[in-house]
């Protein structure tokens, strides 16, 4: 049976939540992270205005100030973000009980069995997007696909406030031209190895010799080759969404990073 998997990503999550509480900062460059008064720590999230100046997640606060002198830093309030994350999960729960959080601001949803009552995946994604704006005041980017890997790629494809399909009859056209580093689980080290093999795009990876990939990357080579070709049967794992894990740097990391 063909599956319908969504991946929902809350856009600039921490900054978006903060702007709900600081409407006077809308349209101005804003970043959340570290200790703004001491200028210690790193950027956890920047809003899209700050990103246009070159501010990036993981950048030291002093570096962000250099590239964007008018930026406003706000200290992180994890309890607040967790509350919004749980409210997002409550919205998702209206469409499926098969939900797998990916960090605090992203989730996979298996809506295969929801079509009869809720409509197809694209319609469900539209409803979720609309409700997130209306009920929580934030936007999401949603990928709609037949597996988790391409659903995630779909949510990354266009931001903010977008819905992108990656169906079986279109993923080659949409995904294969993207940089291979856009594929989930291709980190910096793996990307460098693939680059040394002449693999630049997801399409290059899909058309590569699987045996050679295994020789260079071990078991992960075969896994990534399968992902690039649309072979991903991994299930959406049923997680306890009432106790979401915070997977970003700890408060201590934020205060000691330079």
Label the predicted regions.
Residues 17-19, 42-45, 150-158, 218, ...:
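Short acidic, glycine/serine/threonine-rich loops at helix termini
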Residues 1-104, 108, 115, 228:
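Residues that scaffold, gate, or flank divalent-cation-dependent active/transport sites
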Residues 120-124, 128-177:
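Long, highly charged, low-complexity intrinsically disordered interaction regions
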């Amino acid at each position: 049976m063909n599956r319908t998997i969504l991946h929902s990503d809350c856009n600039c999550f921490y900054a978006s939540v903060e702007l709900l509480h600081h409407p006077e900062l809308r349209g101005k460059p804003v970043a959340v992270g570290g200790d703004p008064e001491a200028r210690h720590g790193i950027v956890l999230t920047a809003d899209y205005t700050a990103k246009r100046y070159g501010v990036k997640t993981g950048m030291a606060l002093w570096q962000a100030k250099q590239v964007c002198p008018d930026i406003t830093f706000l200290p992180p309030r994890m309890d607040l973000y967790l509350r919004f994350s749980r409210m997002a999960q409550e919205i998702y729960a209206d469409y499926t009980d098969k939900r797998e959080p990916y960090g605090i601001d992203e989730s996979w949803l298996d809506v295969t069995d929801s079509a009869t009552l809720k409509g197809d995946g694209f319609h469900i994604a539209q409803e979720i997007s609309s409700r997130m704006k209306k009920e929580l005041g934030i936007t999401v980017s949603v990928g709609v696909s037949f597996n988790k890997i391409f659903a995630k790629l779909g949510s990354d494809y266009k931001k903010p406030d977008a819905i992108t399909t990656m169906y079986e009859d279109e993923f080659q056209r949409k995904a294969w031209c993207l940089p291979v580093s856009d594929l989930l689980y291709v980190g910096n080290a793996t990307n460098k190895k693939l680059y040394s093999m002449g693999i630049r795009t997801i399409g290059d990876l899909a058309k590569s010799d699987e045996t050679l990939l295994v020789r260079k990357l071990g078991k992960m080579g075969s896994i990534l080759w399968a992902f690039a070709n649309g072979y991903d049967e991994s299930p959406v794992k049923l997680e306890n969404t009432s106790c979401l894990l915070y997977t970003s740097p700890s408060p201590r990391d934020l205060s000691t990073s330079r």
